[in-house]
A protein has these predicted regions:
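Bacterial N-terminal signal peptides that target proteins for export
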Residues: 1-10
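Ligand-binding clefts/hinges and TM-proximal coupling segments of bilobed small-molecule sensing domains
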Residues: 26-28, 153-170, 207-208, 237-263
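Acidic, polar ligand-binding/catalytic clefts
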Residues: 67, 71, 76-140, 204-212
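Hydrophobic residues within well-ordered alpha-helices
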Residues: 69, 92-93, 139, 179-181, ...
Length: 263
């Protein structure tokens, strides 16, 4: 289900003196935002996409990188909200959304095209207060229920890792927190920035030591727009080198990330 999140209050305009440079900028905008508006897919509850700070202001990797890119292109931005990232990937594949930031998996690369990595993020497990599960080795036991986001990397990967524990899909992060309260799951598996965000809402909850893998976050665009990838790769490199990416992480409270390797 998609919900229009409204257009940003600004329309960023780039003023370029040379006609050739202006035409080049227009060409870049048409590559990434052929409708004239950059449609950015976001989902609430994860700093890698969008969260809201104490003042009610939205932040997040997809949210803020999308805003910075729209400003660079000189086009308005439309944030389109979904319940989970799998729905955004489908919308990008179908041409309903222009981009998002998500884990660049081989499976998703069959549906969308990716920029160079933006960040690397550890994957982990969250357990509630007073959980008998104290380490990863305690998980694969009869009766243990592992929550994952429906359509996520965790849902596809963990069934091959755990032979005894049960995988329980949740519609969203918000739903998963409620599932903890009802005893429907014993732990939750996803990227650590999301787990930290969840733990802030669950007194006494903790993230287990170690990790079970890593996500490589990148900008995803529809297939057929590969001509835009050099522009996106330059944009990513500039956001990394200028410190802008560090600021985005701090504003979103994004924890559990490391620098991305570049091919």
């Amino acid at each position: 289900m998609r919900i229009s999140f409204g257009r940003a209050a600004y329309t960023a305009l780039l003023f370029v003196c040379l006609p050739g440079a202006s035409a080049h900028a227009d060409g870049e905008a048409k590559l990434l935002a052929p409708s004239g508006t950059l449609r950015v897919g976001i989902y609430p509850g994860s700093p890698t996409s969008m969260v809201t700070d104490a003042a009610g202001k939205p932040h997040g990797l997809a949210y803020d990188l999308g805003g910075a890119l729209a400003k660079r292109l000189g086009v308005p931005i439309d944030y389109v909200r979904f319940q989970r990232v799998a729905d955004i990937v489908t919308a990008i594949h179908d041409g309903q959304v222009d981009l998002t930031v998500t884990n660049a998996t081989p499976a998703r690369a069959n549906e969308v095209s990716f920029s160079e990595p933006v960040l690397a993020i550890e994957l982990g497990y969250l357990v509630p207060a007073n959980s008998p599960i104290g380490k990863a080795e305690d998980i694969d036991k009869p009766g243990v229920k592992i929550g994952v986001t429906k359509g996520s990397t965790s849902e596809r990967t963990l069934p091959t890792k755990f032979k005894t524990a049960t995988i329980v899909p949740a519609e969203s992060v918000k739903v998963a927190i409620a599932m903890f309260g009802r005893g429907e799951i014993d732990l939750y598996a996803t990227n650590k920035p999301t787990l930290f965000e969840m733990s802030d809402q669950m007194p006494g909850a903790k993230i287990l030591d170690g990790n079970w893998g890593a996500e490589h976050m990148a900008i995803a665009v529809p297939k057929g727009r590969e001509a835009a990838l050099p522009l996106l790769n330059r944009f990513v490199a500039e956001e990394q080198s200028s410190g802008a990416l560090d600021t985005i992480q701090q504003q979103a409270g994004l924890r559990g990330a490391t620098k991305a390797g570049r091919e």
